[in-house]
Amino acid sequence: SELFRKKLERALAGQPKGSGILHVHPRFVSIAAGQKRKNLLWAEGRGYSLKIRGDEAVMPGEFRLDFEKN
């Protein structure tokens, strides 16, 4: 969704480009990806390669970003 993308945009601000894992509550995997993977493609266009993982420990509507160490 657009709201999720805006939250993601704020979280990525200032982060170095690279690969990472976006942890979301399992019910929010589809929302995090966006319609036709729009949110993932948006991030890719800005230099971030993100994979989404369902994680019961993450509150619904929230997310956690873990970037791979280079």
Predicted regions and their residues:
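Auxiliary Fe-S-binding modules of radical SAM enzymes
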Residues: 1-70
